[in-house]
């Protein structure tokens, strides 16, 4: 089963072609890691999956991003786009909790916008904090401001905020790049515990991280999809010489 079917996806920023005919299936309830050097199109690819690309006035797309049988790139109605983003959550590179809000209110924010009953909101908040491996650290201080948390805790709070919406897909754009090794490992453990429940697309520039957590890996270079395979196969037996060279430079010989 696939969560997304991407077909001949092209993205233009003005005259610059940022993605060049990407065709890729994202398997359902697995972790797909996206690797490649800076500027290769990894983040642009995520923006197409969550339709953030539509917020960029000078961006133009071609091709298809099929989700639940529909090409979501054709959505124009704001209600359809918002509904899609509820099903496809996103965690960004830099932790971005609302610092003026309490820990609890950060997680509850999107649910309140939906007009959900407060009793159900409370259940969802606790559920999301537990799934994000944060509940045991904050349960007795949910009224504290989010700014009181460490960087790693703030990122897990952002994961909880996304999970509270019960998304079918969670997109993660280099979510550990600002974190120390201990916080990074906790995020990785959280992500691996979530697979099986949620489809995860995880962008990373850290090849050891991709190897640790990915079920499948896609290698992007200069806006092209060079190769995609099971993570084990891609790292140990790459089929394209460009993949092999990149892995050997960044990760060591396979």
Curated annotation (Swiss-Prot):
GO MF entry, a single one: ATPase-coupled phosphate ion transmembrane transporter activity
Protein EC: 7.3.2.1
Keywords on record: ATP-binding, Cell membrane, Membrane, Nucleotide-binding, Phosphate transport, Translocase, Transport
Enzymatic reactions: phosphate(out) + ATP + H2O = ADP + 2 phosphate(in) + H(+)
Disulfide bond sites: none
Pfam family, one: ABC_tran
Membrane topology term: Peripheral membrane protein
GO-annotated biological processes: phosphate ion transmembrane transport
Keyword NAD annotated: no
UniProt subcellular location: Cell membrane
InterPro entries named in the record: AAA+_ATPase (IPR003593), ABC_transporter-like_ATP-bd (IPR003439), ABC_transporter-like_CS (IPR017871), P-loop_NTPase (IPR027417), PstB-like (IPR005670)
GO cellular component: plasma membrane
Gene3D superfamilies, per database record: P-loop containing nucleotide triphosphate hydrolases
SMART domains documented for this protein: AAA
Domain ABC transporter: 4-247
Residue positions binding ATP: 36-43
PANTHER family to which the protein is assigned, alphabetical: ABC TRANSPORTER I FAMILY MEMBER 17
Functional note: Part of the ABC transporter complex PstSACB involved in phosphate import. Responsible for energy coupling to the transport system.
Subunit-structure text: The complex is composed of two ATP-binding proteins (PstB), two transmembrane proteins (PstC and PstA) and a solute-binding protein (PstS).
Protein family per UniProt: Belongs to the ABC transporter superfamily. Phosphate importer (TC 3.A.1.7) family.
Annotated protein name in UniProt: Phosphate import ATP-binding protein PstB
Species this chain originates from: Methanopyrus kandleri (strain AV19 / DSM 6324 / JCM 9639 / NBRC 100938)
């Amino acid at each position: 089963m696939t969560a997304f079917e991407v077909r001949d996806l092209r993205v233009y920023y003005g005259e610059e072609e940022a993605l060049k005919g990407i065709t890729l299936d994202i398997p359902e309830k697995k972790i797909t890691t996206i690797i490649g050097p800076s500027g290769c199109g990894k983040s642009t690819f995520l923006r197409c999956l969550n339709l953030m690309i539509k917020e960029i006035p000078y961006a133009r797309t071609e091709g298809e991003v099929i989700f639940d049988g529909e090409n979501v790139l054709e959505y124009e109605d704001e209600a359809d786009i918002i509904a899609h983003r509820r099903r496809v959550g996103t965690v960004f590179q830099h932790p971005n909790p609302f610092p003026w809000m309490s820990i609890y209110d950060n997680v509850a924010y999107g649910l309140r916008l939906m007009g959900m009953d407060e009793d159900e909101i409370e259940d969802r908040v606790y559920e999301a904090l537990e799934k994000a491996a944060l509940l045991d650290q904050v349960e007795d201080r949910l009224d504290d401001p989010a700014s009181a948390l460490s960087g790693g805790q703030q990122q897990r709070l952002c994961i909880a905020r996304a999970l509270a919406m019960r998304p079918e897909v969670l997109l993660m754009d280099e979510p550990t790049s600002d974190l120390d090794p201990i916080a990074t490992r906790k995020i990785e453990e959280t992500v691996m515990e979530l697979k099986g429940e949620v489809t995860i697309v995880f962008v990373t520039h850290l090849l050891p991280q991709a190897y640790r957590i990915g079920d499948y890996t896609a290698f992007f270079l200069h806006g092209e999809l060079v190769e995609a395979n099971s993570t084990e196969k891609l790292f140990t037996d790459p089929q394209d010489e460009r993949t092999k060279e990149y892995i050997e430079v960044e990760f060591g010989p396979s």
